[in-house]
From Swiss-Prot:
Ranges that cross the membrane: 696-718
Signal peptide start and end residues: 1-31
Role according to the record: May play a role in the regulation of hemostasis. The soluble form may have inhibitory properties towards coagulation factors. May interact with cellular G-protein signaling pathways. May bind to the DNA 5'-GTCACATG-3'(CDEI box). Inhibits trypsin, chymotrypsin, plasmin, factor XIA and plasma and glandular kallikrein. Modulates the Cu/Zn nitric oxide-catalyzed autodegradation of GPC1 heparan sulfate side chains in fibroblasts.
Biased composition (Basic and acidic residues): 272-284
Disulfide bond recorded as keyword: yes
Protein name (record): Amyloid beta precursor like protein 2
Subcellular location field: Membrane
Keyword entries, A-Z: Copper, Disulfide bond, Glycoprotein, Membrane, Metal-binding, Phosphoprotein, Protease inhibitor, Proteoglycan, Serine protease inhibitor, Signal, Transmembrane, Transmembrane helix
SUPFAM superfamilies in alphabetical order: A heparin-binding domain, Amyloid beta a4 protein copper binding domain (domain 2), BPTI-like, CAPPD, an extracellular domain of amyloid beta A4 protein
Gene that this polypeptide is encoded by: Aplp2
Limits of the E2 domain: 375-566
Disulfide bonds: C56-C80, C91-C133, C116-C123, C149-C203, C160-C190, C174-C202, C312-C362, C321-C345, C337-C358
Amino acid sequence: MAATGTAAAAATGKLLVLLLLGLTAPAAALAGYIEALAANAGTGFAVAEPQIAMFCGKLNMHVNIQTGKWEPDPTGTKSCLGTKEEVLQYCQEIYPELQITNVMEANQPVNIDSWCRRDKKQCRSHIVIPFKCLVGEFVSDVLLVPENCQFFHQERMEVCEKHQRWHTVVKEACLTEGMTLYSYGMLLPCGVDQFHGTEYVCCPQTKVVDSDSTMSKEEEEEEEEDEEEDYALDKSEFPTEADLEDFTEAAADEDEDEEEEEEEEGEEVVEDRDYYYDSFKGDDYNEENPTEPSSDGTISDKEIAHDVKAVCSQEAMTGPCRAVMPRWYFDLSKGKCVRFIYGGCGGNRNNFESEDYCMAVCKTMIPPTPLPTNDVDVYFETSADDNEHARFQKAKEQLEIRHRSRMDRVKKEWEEAELQAKNLPKAERQTLIQHFQAMVKALEKEAASEKQQLVETHLARVEAMLNDRRRIALENYLAALQSDPPRPHRILQALRRYVRAENKDRLHTIRHYQHVLAVDPEKAAQMKSQVMTHLHVIEERRNQSLSLLYKVPYVAQEIQEEIDELLQEQRADMDQFTSSISENPVDVRVSSEESEEIPPFHPFHPFPSLSENEDTQPELYHPMKKGSGMAEQDGGLIGAEEKVINSKNKMDENMVIDETLDVKEMIFNAERVGGLEEEPDSVGPLREDFSLSSSALIGLLVIAVAIATVIVISLVMLRKRQYGTISHGIVEVHPMLTPEERHLNKMQNHGYENPTYKYLEQMQI
């Protein structure tokens, strides 16, 4: 019956846990853990999880899981354990009724009142980081993710780190994201207080999480202690037993002296607050006027700032122990964290395990770097964004204002110098004039150089943004083509975005050329061929991308009209640009030559119109197979190699998309779209419409004529070669030849020909 009652109580507790889980995840996790403790203990209902706390020179403390209060060591002898294994053994001794399997350092420090020394009546309050005694199978904590905060986790099966190391890792990870650590927990235990991973919640630095009106007093204290923990130091490694004895005796002597002074004065013992970050209490923890706690028990931001200043302004202290532990301390004179050797005990709180953790705590001691107020400096120091053009205009205006200010100052100095130099000889006045002319020339040269740098930076950023947008649009377009079954509406939307991205690149190139043409015609004439080549490549790349639609003929026919409209709009812009170039009298000859390179517009008709009797449903074509196209990483459509191409390519059967102007682009092979059985009746007209422009047709004809000429010449040479072996001249006979060789030479002189060689020559023809 007792077992049945216990099982019923456990089932009832689990049901309550499930009901509370939807309301508050952390409370549910804690309730479930306490219920497990109660079931494991078998004696009463647990209200707290088992924990122990240590402070050298004082008796160890542990939590009474039935009352939730801290109690001293029952034997009255145990104090300051040396290793994590000893901590685990002590947990098992204190809680024999529980199945303690591991220990873990707590995330937050706690304030323990009335902490007494062994065989002494003197008691004080100390803030320490306790150890949790884990019961049964390890269960990770349930973390609450407030609004605007983010949840992360890290798992590294190849490493096994202690709790404090993971704490440092997650703090640095949040700082890297520009956020602060809100809460964290451990994952996958691999040893005593060692784990394979962690989970954590990061919140924005300006995020202030308001406590709920129904939050209990314990939860409020945990939040306040969490703020205090942000400035806490790493716990040191456990020292040796000899170090423990030396330091414990020193602490005992100090406490006895203090106790005698208090008894002589007859004053009551006043509890103070000592911070406990290392394994031991330092002699100088309260050297620099520790901040008194607030009357309401909370720690204000002012108190925290004062405590950080007191910590980070201390000098490095090795301590009385003789271990060799590389640590970091904040050097106030240098404004950065510097290495030093820690002895293993004592010392002060300016003691950190890593440089990043040191800087995270003491960064408020570094005076902030003044932000640049000049728009030009701001432009160069910030990366490109959607406001690139506006920031460029502001920087250019600021550059012009700065140049005018410098010129006005030099002009004013020049005028003052001329007034003072009226009575000087002519040679000296001439030298003065040359000096100021050189200054003006240098300022103009400097302004031109700064403006050139600004323009080049702007162009590079714009080109990079255009390339990124085009790449993303092309990837989406190819992904839409690869979908099974392909959706015409989605393909058309992706194609519109891709064509729009290409058009933005075209307009940017045109506007830049027109601007250079208006400012510097000579430079425009030099870059004109490059601009025309780039525009031609844009059109070829667009046509090659459109030609991929022949892999899905049903979709191509359905969106044919919309594609024609897109091409007509872009062709109108291109014709306007060509006409604007031709109107320039300086470049008429070049424009007329290069304008012929631009292929005439042909509406997009990839397939002949199908009759109503012909079935145009998707089952006529085979959809692209996943794994044969883009899905393959090595041979896929998008997984192709990157290459820098500096000249126009020829459109061959591989349909390679290229790029010029030293812009890295992806090269796509249309054969890899794959999975289709090409039909000559449908593929032929498409390639003729897309790849055979007037200039390309002339080039092909020239190549064909050249090939035919080579073939004819080769045939003529072969025909002559048949009779080329007959020689009617006199051949000198070598005196050392055998009679057979001499006879063969005579026969060849009279027209003899080996029939075997003649047969082989005829076979080659």
